[in-house]
UniProtKB/Swiss-Prot annotation:
Residues 82-105, 641-686, 1013-1060, 1077-1164 are annotated as: Disordered. Induction: By salt stress, abscisic acid (ABA), jasmonic acid (JA), the ethylene precursor ACC and infection by the bacterial pathogen Xanthomonas oryzae pv. oryzae. A zinc finger (C2H2-type) spans 1167-1189, 1190-1214, 1220-1244, 1250-1276. It is an enzyme of class 1 (oxidoreductase). Expressed in leaves and flag leaves. Expressed at low levels in roots, shoots, stems and panicles. It is found in: Nucleus. The gene is JMJ705. Residues 641-679, 1119-1136 have a biased composition (Polar residues). Disruption phenotype: Reduced plant height, panicle length, spikelets per panicle and spikelet fertility. Increased susceptibility to the bacterial pathogen Xanthomonas oryzae pv. oryzae. Residues 25-66 form the JmjN domain. Plants over-expressing JMJ705 display a leaf lesion-mimic phenotype in mature leaves, have high levels of biotic stress-responsive and defense-related genes leading to enhanced plant resistance to the bacterial pathogen Xanthomonas oryzae pv. oryzae. It comes from Oryza sativa subsp. japonica. It catalyses: N(6),N(6),N(6)-trimethyl-L-lysyl(27)-[histone H3] + 2 2-oxoglutarate + 2 O2 = N(6)-methyl-L-lysyl(27)-[histone H3] + 2 formaldehyde + 2 succinate + 2 CO2. This is Lysine-specific demethylase JMJ705.
Amino acid sequence: MRPSPPPAAPAAEPVPPWLRSLPVAPEFRPTAAEFADPVSYILKIEPAAAPYGICKVVPPLPPPPKKATFSNLSRSFAALHPDDRSPSFPTRHQQVGLCPRRTRPGLKPVWRSSHRYTLPQFESKAGATRKSLLAGLNFPASRQLTPLDHEVLFWRASADRPIVVEYGSDMSGSGFSPCAAQPQPPPQQQPTARAAAHLGETAWNMRGVARSPGSLLRFMPEDVPGVTTPMLYVGMMFSWFAWHVEDHDLHSLNYMHLGAAKTWYGVPRDAALAFEDVVREHGYGGEVNPLETFATLGQKTTVMSPEVLVESGIPCCRLVQNAGEFVVTFPGSYHCGFSHGFNCGEASNIATPEWLRIAKEAAIRRASINRPPMVSHYQLLYDLALSMRFREPSNGEMETRSSRIKEKKKCEGEQLVKKMFIQNVIEDNELLSHLLNDGSSCIILPANAHDGPGLSTLRSTDQSNMNSRISHNLCSREEAPEASGCLSPNRNGDTRNCISSDTHNMEGDKGDIMSATGLLDQGLLSCVTCGILSFSCVAVLKPRDSTARYLMSADSNSINNQLSISGGSILADAPTNERNGVISRPYSEHCCNEIMADDAEIDKNSALDLLAFAHGGQPDPEEDPLEKILKIAHGINKSQPNSSNNVGCVGTKLSSSSTERQERPSSQNAHCNGSSVISNGPKGVRTRNKYQLKMVLSEGFQAKDIYSAKEKKVQSEPSSSKGDVKETIDVSGTENDVGCKSTTISVSEHRGSTKNMYSVKEKKVQSKPSSLKGTVKETVDVSGTENDARCKSITISVSEHRGSTPMTNSLAASIVKPDKDSSRMHVFCLEHAIEVEKQLHAIGGSNIMLICRPEYPKIEAEARLLGEEMGLVYDWKGIHFKEANMEDRQKIQEVLRDEEAIPTSSDWAVKLGINLYYSANLAKSPLYNKQMPYNRVIYRAFGCDSPNDSPVMFNTCERKQSHQKKIVVAGRWCGKVWMSKQVHPYLAHRVESQEAEEADRICSYHFDEKHKAEPVGNSSRVEASKRKSSSLTDVTESSNRRGEIPGEETNTKRPKHSQENNLRALETAAEVVVPSPAGTGLRVSSRIANRANKLKSKMEKEDVPSSRPKSNIKEKSSHASGQKSNVQEANANSASHLRAMPPKQKAEAEAKKQIRTPKPPKQAVEYSCDIEGCSMSFRTKRDLSLHKSDICPVKGCGKKFFSHKYLLQHRKVHTDDRPLTCPWKGCNMAFKWPWARTEHLRVHTGDRPYVCHEPGCAQTFRFVSDFSRHKRKTGHSVKKKKKAKS
């Protein structure tokens, strides 16, 4: 019997076609001279490597000695856990494989391992794991595998049954020796300096590469692990790092010390939004919205094969990193990879000047998921630009520069930084000039000694040093509790490093006030709309009282509808004084930035205060006097929640006689204007960092009221003071004159009555037809419910009626004191401050306070000098600054307290749809699994289509094609030219959006030049609200160009083929927000540029002003003659063309010209629904089919309904149809649903139908949501009682 032959060796795993055709990222081999400066070299290769997303750099020097590397690694591991005897490190378990039960196949489980390894132990563990993995894949361990073989096996294992590997990641430390203390020699001395022996002696040493010269991260005030200091990574075979993008879209530098290779995959930044959409659909099952997709990708647990990306039209590339090589990832590029075996590497971030182009957008996207910012890109820009400006260094961080080197060696990065610095200061100057049109001042914060070197040079020597600021550089969730811990009160109740809110004593608050001087550094004053940390200037907006009253009684939908109406104010009684088209704010000449401006001052011991105190109320020194009178004349609203008071007084005379006053504590809480503490909620939530509060809310905690009421006491007089005190106060109201002209209120205070009763003794109304005069007398017996009485009777006599017109409830609602949420102060960047002020102007107006850094005037002066040196011309506006006094500092404290509050639906910024944090938290709700709640900033940052936006058709972009198919190039990525039909729809849309942006730029420039000589009218603030572009543009051009505020209603019909309509279409495009993927950075093609130049020249020729006025007839005749001349010119051109033709072709052309007749215009085909009772029609059959299947055909919605009737009602959501109007006289609100109108009517009628039947409670509620919340929080449930009885 023959022995059986030995088993044949397994054949090599076939490489799939998608992997074989995957582009390879570029590899660069710099010379020793190029390798000297890492930032300059990365900036040099960035234009060629950024379209790949990643690249490899092979250094010209050998790696450090292995002995020194192992020694440095051991010291780093020992520093992680000093208690351990051996230098060990922890690991994490990672799953490789596919679990069929998971609804989100892209998410891989990761959990912390209980084992700790030294480096040799983990190397042996990695070897054993490699053998078991290859055995499971039917490969012998002795066989040598190529990088492609590793990739094939990894993706095959990812689709097979789950296996577990270990990975040591995110460990602070480095394998390089510490950097030398002495600075690098200047460039002119480098040739004579000693040459570096190995990589550790160069500027590419990972311990200091983040703070190398030219990197913006060198100006970060404190070290952040993984960003400014390196982190170590130790892996084994198939240890993976998930798809992710760097924090703030920074560059990253990754070095491999030793071991097996790593495979990297990269997606360029231009395709980032398309990548996220593919991950959402294929990796997460399409059950999350784009915002949650971005947040989930930030958790670094998403692994998905590049095969899915390639099939979806996403550019993707690969590279293999070996020991001793660097991998550079560029801003905004997604990347992932895995290890081929045991290896050890480290990574750190850098920031070249090119990062500044996209830093703003990256900060907005980070703020959209409520992640705290680690750095302000404006701060880094200012520090780097000013460090280049000054010749003499203020400390050791800046380099000395000779004038000769500066003239001869002007780095491209330096020029870019200086231009962006000047552009940013110019934009701030332009916006400040528009916000300060009324002659007010910009408040300068007190100086803080903790700034960058460039800003420290600007400080004068006599400024005092302040307390050290709180670092806002939180790099992980683990650091968040530590940061909040240092900001919370200690056991003794003293608050450290925060502004005290427990006292009104200014002497006690002085230290806390001074601690607020570094607000712009601490990141506490970030824009509510976009989340940007404004480094130089911020604006604080607070709605006026009339605006706040309207915001209290309206919902967000009605407000947005009213804001969309152009011209006029919503409130008839809104005091909107205008001067030269600019909102006139109630400022005085001495204090121009008042936030709380009272119309009249009342003494604390006035009769109004005494009477209010007699009714159990708390006298408020800052309360409006008219509101005090209303509280007195209409009883105690809190005691009668079901009553509805109709009041309309303009002038009021009140006289009171007080026999005795006593101090009595009040059982009611009043709103606190000057101080507040965070009392509600779980322990440990008291923190100065608002991002921690937003994080608490996102985890399910929602505070009842972030502001607790504080009691105010009234000083009591001695009992022996029995003399009568009378005083008469005349108050002029600012509201409508509906009721009486004058009112006399007589108050007598006596003691002895203990009952609480409200009885009308006498009411007489006498009127004469001639004089229209009448008298009303009311005697009301009022007694307090506690201790002793305050008033025996109140007599109100009314005379001199203007008419018999009844007083309306709308006036009573307009005089109610606004609540905290409707009058809260919010911080905005200057750009969004103008937009928000325009919105508030439509419903009553707002008050503004502008705050800037103490050195900002000098920064502006340096920008002027730098602009003159670079030859940039700009007409600088004069800005008036003033030092912050104690009153301004109190307001800044109030701003900080308001910023601490967790946003709720009653916040006025939420109702206007401009609160980024609220929208981000709302997007986490299960109601928004597939579609985000609309927020203009978030939609723009994540490339989503606005519900109200539709594409604009451009005749200028059309070119008649005969039979040749139009070929559109989408872009060039990963070394390949991609057509529009080969890429993802997000990328295919880039050409259209690029043309729209180009048309926007041309038209804005054209119309700005046209109206440059005209005076600035009502649109001055609108013109100033142009979006501050993150990309570098010509400063002279950007200073003259002002766009329109997006979001306005535009005409989206297809215009006719005429030159005037072309201009109209371009003008429309300048106002429409064209939804496009964020981060588009393609160069404009020559075709678009040429067409833009031709169109621009045509418009400039047409706008030449006429030398003399002409009549309409002459204009028409000249227009007709111009058309005639154009026709003659066209005929002449056609005739010359015919003469050049051969005789036969000429005859055929003439015959065709005679026979040719104009074709009728094509009509759009509509597909109507034939279901009974439905009259809807659609453009495509697909939409009609979905509609008949009771599925919403609107893109991004796709909701399914049980009947066609509900689908027709759902249409109101997209069309914003509001057929139901409020029947109350004077109210213009409209509603989509009947229940919404029913609940709104209760605001007018005062009806509170929901009563809590819990013994001892008896609270009433107006809305069922409030009643449900009350039962849920207190446990007062009727069902529990029924169960208990049964």
